[in-house]
């Protein structure tokens, strides 16, 4: 079959019309130094701060130092296979992590990659790890409570949705236990929790995840783990990655709780990177921008205005102190950024007061306006009572004679300390907290032996659940106290039963005092 000349010319014309002159331009540099999680590269004159760069082995890095001759890069992943002379190219993107519902119930690394062995995470949504915090007009005052389930916190230092509340204390004072109990208490509260573990042993994180699974809390929780064995760059970006995951929910009108455990280790990782990148050291060898490191992170937690959906992100950053020194650099920085702090005292912890919240040093600057009416009524004077008890307790060490009023204050104080104790992984619903604190502040516990207080509390809840469930229901629905007469009658009913069955109205402590006086 002969080919016609017209057909050939038509084909050529069509190809010319469809021809596109596409030039693929890549800016490629050369690695001049690599080691300890950082690299330097020459030839990336147009690289931008925070830009994602790709190495020839497939690893990624983030541009940090933009110098006249080279670029300082932190390597996000395996740096041992990168060699001097390797190529590194610009991507024109900033670092992003996968976000969305697919991450709920999973354990991921700071790059959003699954590390729990449950398969791939299928999501098409991504968010940049660094983002602008909401402005003043995009925010709303904190007005909803975020219940932790811990009496010592919900009564003395209440937290609201959208607040930043620092948890600070020495190692082994129960900071992580507060985090886990708070997550457990969010069950059924329409809250998504993100637990960011920074610089912890993988075995410790595994234990926490098992606890969350046991109580059904992984159904609404994402765990981001940057373990102690990970390179410093991953510890540095972990909190930002967790916050980006939380922002996806917050900007869609949902409520998020994010816990950073802990920011001291992130600051140490950032100090390591800064010193390796030859940035000038400042106080305690931290770089000059270590305040900005934490402020730009924590400012992203907010209660959004109704125009933006009314979502919220509540942040609980943890900071570890050395020998209770809260005047060190990182603790003072984070105290000044947050809306209050919960100080955990090691002496209280070892004395058996757990959670070991120091009522004198702990404060919540905005949470009071989010407390429910019932809690405000019963816990209003609790902090002052506790502070005056601690003061009086110090004086009684001298063994001076006490008048009846002082003795009554001491007795009430001992019972207050006892009632604020709580078992591990046993968060209390707010209505139950209100009832037991009401019983305390209205003198129902004054004749109960101190060593029987927690037994009385547990059995009182069982009695009310069975015989007066409407009391709990009223507090839960109205957020206010039921009729005082009804509440007094119910508590007195059970108190009479308790004292009759125990057949003892004096504690061991009171008996010893009577022997000494005799």
From Swiss-Prot:
Role noted for this protein: Produces ATP from ADP in the presence of a proton gradient across the membrane. The alpha chain is a regulatory subunit.
UniProt key word Cell membrane: yes
Reaction(s) catalysed (UniProt annotation): ATP + H2O + 4 H(+)(in) = ADP + phosphate + 5 H(+)(out)
Subunit structure: F-type ATPases have 2 components, CF(1) - the catalytic core - and CF(0) - the membrane proton channel. CF(1) has five subunits: alpha(3), beta(3), gamma(1), delta(1), epsilon(1). CF(0) has three main subunits: a(1), b(2) and c(9-12). The alpha and beta chains form an alternating ring which encloses part of the gamma chain. CF(1) is attached to CF(0) by a central stalk formed by the gamma and epsilon chains, while a peripheral stalk is formed by the delta and b chains.
Pfam families named among the record's database cross-references: ATP-synt_ab, ATP-synt_ab_C, ATP-synt_ab_N
The keyword Transmembrane is annotated on this UniProt entry: no
UniProt site (Required for activity): 362
The family this protein is said to belong to: Belongs to the ATPase alpha/beta chains family.
EC number in record: 7.1.2.2
SUPFAM superfamilies: C-terminal domain of alpha and beta subunits of F1 ATP synthase, N-terminal domain of alpha and beta subunits of F1 ATP synthase, P-loop containing nucleoside triphosphate hydrolases
GO cellular component: plasma membrane; proton-transporting ATP synthase complex
GO molecular function: ADP binding; ATP binding; proton-transporting ATP synthase activity, rotational mechanism
InterPro entries in UniProt: ATP_synth_asu-like_sf (IPR023366), ATP_synth_asu_C (IPR000793), ATP_synth_asu_C_sf (IPR038376), ATP_synth_F1_a_nt-bd_dom (IPR033732), ATP_synth_F1_asu (IPR005294), ATPase_a/bsu_AS (IPR020003), ATPase_F1/V1/A1_a/bsu_N (IPR004100), ATPase_F1/V1/A1_a/bsu_N_sf (IPR036121)
UniProt entry keywords in alphabetical sequence: ATP synthesis, ATP-binding, Cell membrane, CF(1), Hydrogen ion transport, Ion transport, Membrane, Nucleotide-binding, Translocase, Transport
Protein's organism: Enterococcus hirae (strain ATCC 9790 / DSM 20160 / JCM 8729 / LMG 6399 / NBRC 3181 / NCIMB 6459 / NCDO 1258 / NCTC 12367 / WDCM 00089 / R)
Subcellular location: Cell membrane
Membrane topology, as annotated: Peripheral membrane protein
Name of the encoding gene: atpA
Binding-site residues, ATP: 169-176
Protein name: ATP synthase subunit alpha
